[in-house]
Each structure stands twice: as C-alpha cells, then as structure tokens.
From Swiss-Prot:
Catalytic reaction equation(s): 3-methyl-2-oxobutanoate + acetyl-CoA + H2O = (2S)-2-isopropylmalate + CoA + H(+)
Pathway: Amino-acid biosynthesis; L-leucine biosynthesis; L-leucine from 3-methyl-2-oxobutanoate: step 1/4
Comment field (misc): In Mycobacteria this gene has a variable number tandem repeat (VNTR); in ATCC BAA-935 / AF2122/97 there are 5 repeats, other strains can have up to 6 repeats.
Biased composition, class Polar residues, residue ranges: 31-40
GO biological process: L-leucine biosynthetic process
Subcellular location: Cytoplasm
Cofactor needs: Mg(2+)
GO (cellular component) term, any one: cytoplasm
Pfam families noted in UniProt: HMGL-like (PF00682), IPMS_D2 (PF22615), LeuA_dimer (PF08502)
Organism annotation: Mycobacterium bovis (strain ATCC BAA-935 / AF2122/97)
Keywords: Amino-acid biosynthesis, Branched-chain amino acid biosynthesis, Cytoplasm, Leucine biosynthesis, Magnesium, Metal-binding, Repeat, Transferase
Descriptive protein name: 2-isopropylmalate synthase
Family: Belongs to the alpha-IPM synthase/homocitrate synthase family. LeuA type 2 subfamily.
Length: 701
C-alpha cells in the first residue's frame, strides 16, 4: 500500500467522506447575487459561542480606537508549551540551543520547562542554573499544576536561581468542570487557591530566589467572565501582590473559540474589573485554532493586556501558539520597536527548525522562504519601480538608501532589515511580466534592459515558463541568463565580428574611421567605414557588404566597477539584409538611400546631437550620379528640446552600388526587420559593435 493509500486515524475509523457539491436551498434572506447553496456539512452539531459559553457585551469598549505604540512584555514558551507539542521533544542539547537563542534575541522572561512532570525538564532547569547560563536580567519561568507534590518538586528544580516565575494553573471552563473534573465552581476555585497557598509556603523555604507568581485559569475562553474574575481575585488575595511585586494573571485562549474582537472584549472587561489591578500584570496566551491568534493577541493587547506569551514561528499544540516573530515584526513594520532582535531571521529560523525538528512554512510571515518573493508580473513591476524610486530619493536627499523611509509596494518591510537579500524578492514563472524579468537581469546579471527590450525578452521567458506541458514552472536566474545569451549573444551567422581598429578624429566634430575584420557566412573579410563615432562608422562599413542598419535607439552602461568591469550596449535597429549583387544581378541603384540614425556616443565632445556628420567616400566602380567628392550625410536623431528637426525626419547615407548593380529602385522589396541587439565587452566601443552584430544576426533569423 502506498503512502497516499494509507488510511489515517480518522478515515480508518469512520471511512472517507465524499465531497458533495452543495445543492441545498439558499439561506433565508440570501441576496440574489449570491449563488451559493446549503451544504451537507453537519452544522447542527455546533453552536454559537454565545450559546456555548455566554454572550459578551461590553459597553463603551475602547480597544478599537487604540493604536499600539509600544511593545508588550514578551514571554517565550518554546521550551515548554512548544516542546510538549513536538513529535520528537527536544533533547537537552536542543533545549540549550533554543534557550541561548531566546536570550540573544532579547527575551527577558523564558518558560524553561515543566520540571515536576519530566525528569528531562528538571535536569535542564538545574543545568542552566548551575552552569550560570541565565543572565541577571532574564527570569526563567516554570509550569506546574496545582497539586502539592508537583509544586514542591517545581521549587526544588528552581533552587539557586536568582529569580523565577512559578506558573500554576487549573482549568476553569464550563466543559472541563463538567467532563474532566466533575466539580462545581467552588471546588474548582479551591484547586486554584490551594495551589496559591502552597506556592507561597514553598517560596518561603527558598529565600535566596526572587519569586514571582503567575496564575492561569486554563481554558479561559470557555469560562464565564464573572467566574474567571472571581477565581483570579481569590488567587490574588492569597498571593497578596503589590505594584512592586505584581502577580501575573494569564488569560489563555487555550482553545480559540471565537473571533478576535470577542476575545478583546473579554480582555478589556477583565482589565476593568479585576481587583487590585495596579498589582496585576495582565497576560495573554492565544492559540491559533481558528487561525486568528495574532489578531487576538494584538486586539487583546490594545484592550489592556500588558504581556504576551507565545512561541517563535507559532509552534505549539494543534495549530500552535501565537507567533512571537509575527507579533514582533508587525510592530516593527509600523515603526514600533519590538525590543527583540530579529535582524537575522534566517539564523532564527534555522535554529528553530533544528530544535523543533519541524520546518517553517514557506509562506510563514516574515520568515518563510517565499514571503519576500513576487511571482506576479504586476507585483514585480511595482517592486522594481519602488526600489528604483528609493534609490533616486536617496540620491536626491544625499543620504544612504538604508536611512530612507521604506516605501516599496508589496513589501511591508525591507528584507535587508531582517538579514535577507533582494536575491529572491522577484522570481519568474508563467505569471510574471517584464518587471520581474528586468529585475532578475539587473540584480543577478548586471544588465539594465531598456523598456522595449524588457517587453521583448519577457515574451521569450514566458514561453519557457509555460513549457511544453503548460505547467507554468519557475525560471531560475541561470535559466534566464542562458535564454538571454542564446537569444542575443550567441548567434554568429551570418555576421561575426573578429576585431576592429578605430581611428578617432583629432578635432571635435571630426570623422571617426574604422577598419574591421568580420566573417560573413564564415568567410573572413575586411570592411571599413567612417562616421561621427565608432558605431556610425561600423554601420557605414556594414552597408558595403549588404547589411543596411538604421540605429533607432541606443543605450549603454557599465555592468560593474573596477579594472575588469564589463560594459553593456543595446541597439534597437531596423536591419535590411541585401547580399552584394552578383554579376548580371538586377540590383540597387546607387542613389537608393540607406537609413541610419545614431545618437552621439559617450566621449564625443563638441558635437550637438543634431549636427550633421559628413562622410566623403570615394565613388565605387560603376557608381553613377555622384562625384567622388560628394558628401554623404549622417545625422543623429533629435534630442529633447532640439529645435529645427523632428526625430522622425529621414536621415540618409548614400551607400555605393556594388559592381554590376543596376536598375533596382528603393521601392523594390527587401528583407527588413526591427530588432534589438545586445553586446557585452570590456570596452563600450566593442560592446556597441557587438550589439550591432547581434541585431544583424537576429534580423537574419
């Protein structure tokens, strides 16, 4: 039998249910725009919270209007409440590693075990006390039931500690009073007060320790509020706390039973009505049965609580305790210091996963592998633009980007603030668009693709992501680079640049000449040309061998800094490929225009972008209609604000006819494509020429 066929405890006992499409009548009053129907789920077996426990009605509640502007006192219960829920409970070594992590993060109250219930826990408490592992500003907390012998054993375990909290509890809920204890209210209250008296008695036997006490009416959410207050007040009378030595009353959602607002109402009611409130630290301990533990904790804190117990990444019984990481970083994301250090979230996660022997989910807030990752195209584009805007704002303010107010769409915090990099912020799959592709190419490969090239290349990646089976899988940065190289860098036919020699003009506005060795369909040949810069000269030279290139747009940038830095160049070009005419071939008239428009190159000083460039090239044999001294004009596109010429005005190079070429008009059909070419090289000149070659080869496909 395979794993998928193996029955679990539920299907084996009761048989697997079959999903049946809901087809019952709509509920009374259901609007016509809602097409949902009644299901066959046995909802009659459950009842509203107000019927199971009691309705909670709080007049003039204040918590909805409160803004959380400070951190609560935290208590980490990973070593007890978290540990008891593990498939493989922590060994002493794993416990110590967890304890040390919690101390380093800044937790000042740490529940370290249930020493009366486990020899392993007892030994661990003794170990950290005897080895001096507890810092002076950290208070350990130990858990015990209210039975006298368990309380005695608990105090023995903590002997010698500088300070300790003894946390005693008993369940007070309606359900547990009936089915577990089979006791009435007074009898259950007596369990709590007897436990409190035993704690006071034992504390007197160990005067070297600063003892504090915590009491939990366990299953508080299933307990009537008046009764929960009654039991807490009775315990308080025994402990006799003061504002300087307060008692902790912990109000756990041992089982989450209703919505967070109801829990918050109950906390505000208790905060208003507990006796001797100034001597009480009101604590929360939410579980996550309904998936709203974080909301319950935050609203309960706004409702008047002072302290929150929980576990890192929400470990704990069933669906877990409230997640201290989420609570702390929620505060951080709104500019409130959690007073805990989360600056290396991956180290925290690795330690927790090792100690608990359980993985942290990829989607777990703040710590999961995918929580700072966008696959959606629109999300990626917004993140990319947000990060760019941050850099521009930092430059404008003349400050470091890390000192700027964080404002990036879809990322509630800067991943770097918790030790992450931007490497995994954007990942590409079939849902991604140009923004994600552009981001990966920039951050992983150093290429700042022009916008139109982003659009073009993203279509290549989209096809890869969709795959032959249409699965929509992820495209890794390496796969993306391989696709880019194959598409833009690899083609070497029909044209391959071997080397070039450039003679730059001595005077501003002069003519640059180039002599280049190229291969055309594998045959090596030498070409030469002139222009207002190396790019224009190379384009002019290519026209002599049948490649008419009009440069429509051009970008360049350095890919990195340093002596071994590479440069990237991008050329958008209209490429017309016409092989040199063969003898007797009906060809091209000498006056037919070849179009080129190329912006001024970096380093070309003294020439306005609109200035014409004159190339005087000798007439070729058989060329009619032009004297050898007639100028050939190249003009680059108009720049913004340039007067007197539109960017769309035609720019022409009269290229010489080849031997035997006669009788072809400019209107004759030719192969012409507008394509992008990319070049990468140590020098920007070589990169720009490679970009032209790339464009020619892509046009030839």
């Amino acid at each position: 039998m395979t794993t998928s066929e193996s029955p679990d405890a539920y299907t084996e006992s009761f048989g697997a249910h079959t999903i049946v499409k809901p087809a019952g009548p709509p509920r009374v009053g259901q609007p016509s725009w809602n097409p949902q129907r009644a299901s066959s789920m046995p909802v009659n077996r459950y009842r509203p919270f107000a019927e199971e426990v009691e309705p909670i009605r709080l007049r003039n509640r204040t918590w909805p209007d409160r803004v959380i502007d400070r951190a609560p006192l935290w208590c980490a219960v990973d070593l007890r409440d978290g540990n008891q829920a593990l498939i493989d409970p922590m060994s002493p070594a794993r416990k110590r590693r967890m304890f040390d992590l919690l101390v380093r993060m800044g937790y000042k109250e740490i529940e370290v075990g249930f020493p009366s219930a486990s020899q392993t826990d007892f030994d661990f408490v003794r170990e950290i006390i005897e080895q001096g592992a507890i810092p002076d500003d950290v208070t350990i907390q130990v858990l015990t039931q209210c039975r006298p012998e368990l309380i005695e054993r608990t105090f023995q375990a903590c002997s010698g500690a500088h300070r300790a909290i003894v946390h005693f509890y008993n369940s007070t809920s309606i359900l547990q009073r009936r089915v577990v204890f089979r006791a009435n209210r007074a009898e259950v209250q007596a369990i709590a007060t007897d436990g409190a008296r035993k704690c006071v008695e034992q504390a007197a036997k160990y005067p070297g320790t600063q003892w504090r006490f915590e009491y939990s009416p366990e299953s508080y959410t299933g307990t009537e509020l008046e009764y929960a207050k009654q039991v807490c007040d009775a315990v308080g009378e025994v402990i006799a706390p003061t504002p300087e030595r307060p008692i902790i009353f912990n109000l756990p959602a041992t089982v989450e039973m209703t919505t967070p607002n109801v829990y918050a109402d109950s906390i505000e009611w208790m905060s208003r009505n507990l006796a001797n409130r100034e001597s009480v630290i009101l604590s929360l301990h939410p579980h996550n049965d309904r998936g709203t533990a974080v909301a319950a904790a935050e609203l309960g804190f706004a409702a008047g609580a002072d302290r929150i117990e929980g576990c890192l990444f929400g470990n704990g019984e069933r669906t877990g305790n409230v997640c201290l990481v989420t609570l702390g970083l929620n505060l951080f994301s709104r500019g409130v210091d959690p007073q805990i250090d989360f600056s290396n979230i991956d180290e925290i996660r690795r330690t927790v996963e090792y100690c608990n022997q359980l993985p942290v989910h990829e989607r777990h807030p703040y710590g999961g592998d995918l929580v700072y990752t966008a696959f959606s195209g629109s999300h990626q584009d917004a993140i990319n633009k947000g990060l760019d805007a941050m850099k521009l704002d930092a430059d404008a303010a003349d400050c470091d980007v890390d000192d700027m107010l964080w404002q990036v769409p879809y990322l509630p915090i800067d991943p770097r603030d918790v030790g992450r990099t931007y490497e995994a912020v954007i990942r590409v799959n079939s849902q991604s668009g140009k923004g994600g592709v552009a981001y990966i190419m920039k951050t992983d490969h150093g290429l700042s693709l022009p916008r139109r090239l982003q659009i073009e290349f993203s279509q290549v990646i989209q096809k890869i992501a969709e795959g032959t089976a249409g699965e929509g899988g992820e495209v890794s940065p390496k796969e993306m680079w391989d696709a880019f190289a194959e598409e833009y860098l690899a083609p070497v036919r029909p044209l391959e640049r071997i080397r070039q020699h450039v003679d730059a003009a001595d005077d501003d506005g002069g003519t640059t000449s180039i002599t280049a060795t190229v291969k055309i369909n594998g045959v090596e040949t030498e070409i030469s040309g002139s222009g207002n810069g190396p790019l224009a000269a190379f384009v002019h030279a290519l026209a002599d061998v049948g490649f008419d290139v009009a440069v429509l747009d051009y970008y360049e940038h350095a890919m990195s800094a340093g002596d071994d830095a590479q440069a990237a160049a991008y050329v958008e070009a209209s490429v017309t490929i016409a092989s040199p005419a063969q003898p007797g071939e009906a060809g091209r008239h000498a006056s037919d225009p070849v179009t080129i428009a190329s912006p001024a190159q970096p380093g070309e000083a003294g020439r306005h972008a609109s200035d014409p460039v004159t190339i005087a090239s000798p007439a070729q044999p058989g060329e009619a209609g032009r004297h050898a001294s007639d100028p050939v004009t190249i003009a680059s596109p108009a720049q913004p604000g340039e007067a007197g010429r539109h960017a769309s005005d035609p720019v022409t190079i009269a290229s010489p006819a080849q031997p035997g070429e006669a009788g072809r008009h400019a209107s004759d059909p030719v192969t012409s494509k507008t394509v992008w070419g990319v070049g990468i090289a140590p020098s920007i000149t070589t990169a720009s020429l490679r970009a032209v070659v790339s464009a020619v080869n892509r046009a030839a496909r």
